[in-house]
Amino acid sequence: MRTFEKKQILKNVGSSWSALAINVIVGVFLSPFIVHRLGDAAFGVWVLIFSITGYYGLFDLGIRSSIIRYVSKYTATDDREKLNGFINTALFSYTGIGVVSMVLTTLLSSSVERFFKIPPEMHAQARLLLLMVGASVSLGFPLGVFGGMLEGLQRFYILNWTSIGATLVRAALIVYFLDRGYGLLTVALITVGLPILSSILRGIIVFRLCPVPLGLKYVDRASFRHMANYGGTTFLVMAAARLRFRTDELVLGTMMSTVAVTWFNFGARIVDYAQEFVSSLAQVFVPMSSQSEAVGNLDRVRKIYIAGNRVCAFLIFPITAILIVFGKHIIRIWVGGRYVPHSYPVLVVMIIPFALMLAQAASTRILFGLGKHQTMAAVTVIEGVGNLILSIALVRPFGIVGDALGTAIPLSFTCLVFLPRHMKKQIGVPVGTFLREAYTLPILLTLPLVAALLLTNRFFYPRNLIQLVIETLVVGSVYMIEMFWAYRTHRAFHVAEVAGLTEPLPAEQPPQAVVSVEYQGEQ
């Protein structure tokens, strides 16, 4: 890999991990602070309303990914006319979508308590909260063009650093106002207002980097066609991702209570942090595989497939072990011991299938990079529908654990049965070869860590966050020493010549559009 590629990857991934670290740290301290100030019911309403408006992301219709694609393309070819047309067409389209979503928000806010089990005393707050969050999301559509432009220009680090700034300011303001007796709506105003300000800042920055004239005269049909053709599969993936990972709170809010939403959220939130950590790395495999395929180097694609998934496994396997063994301590110290009986089972049920998915995070990115993601999108839709049906069926007899099982069962099937076989068909690496080359070393290195975790958990009981962090770092040093050995001996990233181990590929298909999608909580 060329030096500038390595620097770009390190810069973008490093800033992504920095943003994630800040989000985790803020979340660790802010979530219990908010829930203890507002109460379980109010916090559950908060999570529920954000879950509802999260579905507005489907109105994106794949436009964001097309912005990334065509900004990258037109800046590379220095085609200013097409770039101007595309950006203005995207802004025009997003403005229309924002208006529609605001109308929908107004309609929903008048009857939100009819659909969800919200305490009567919180009906008025829930309506106002939905209006505030919905308005922010609606405005976020046209403002999101600026973030898409930055991604197309490969300036992920600008996105990440502006996000870090907004996160820190948000945390400080929430603590300040809650300490002075303000409530749910004040927290909401802070939470939805700062992303708008950061988007405006990104717009100022991106127009200095890449000046684009604005006006209706630049809107054109050709750009509409490009967006429609490119965004179709992206929309399917986005809809499927919502079904997979964003229906749990709605099912619980409809069939149980907002308190159950709070219990579920604490266990699932920890899993989300693990997912974001791995996904921040995995996103670099989209352009890497796309570039390799473009020059006909499929052997390099196969090596990315094995080495990329191995790196993902190096990250998620030890994280999974730590969360399962220390999970009760994490929840107890984070939000309080009374949440452990409810939230820890959710954590365990969710982290295992998510580990299976994240250990193959490179696989899905390679499919997008090669433009061979259509079958995966269809399977994901089927999985999402199965997720929703199972969650509804299991939540009555098993409560929030049943809801978690509704997500875990179909996700495990996709990861264990479908994905490795589908990758074999697409790039020709036999399943046995893939499993052996990608996962033998990560599993062997994780086993001593598991033993150390179990031994430590038996004899030591962390009573506060500092003790928990120290205990985790001491035990984690076992794994770090092993990883240092694997790196120094070149075992960590070495991949044997795989060309001779592969099965013949089917006849090459014409290249499809490459879609850059950040999975939701695969975000």
Residue ranges and their predicted role:
Residues 1-9, 202-245, 284, 288, ...:
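Interhelical loop/hinge segments that connect adjacent transmembrane helices in multipass membrane
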Residues 8-73, 96-106, 136, 171, ...:
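Signature of the first transmembrane helix
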Residues 10, 138-163, 175, 182-185, ...:
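Membrane-interface junctions at transmembrane-helix termini in multi-pass inner-membrane proteins
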Residues 44-60, 89-93, 136, 196-197, ...:
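Alpha-helical transmembrane segments of polytopic membrane transporters and translocases
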Residues 61-77, 91, 152, 210-211, ...:
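Helix-loop junctions and terminal segments of transmembrane helices
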Residues 109-133, 323-355, 427, 461-462, ...:
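Interfacial segments at transmembrane-helix termini and the short loops linking adjacent helices
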Residues 131, 160-209, 226-230, 381-389, ...:
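Hydrophobic alpha-helical transmembrane segments
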Residues 427-431, 453-523:
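Membrane-proximal transmembrane or re-entrant/amphipathic helices at the cytosolic face
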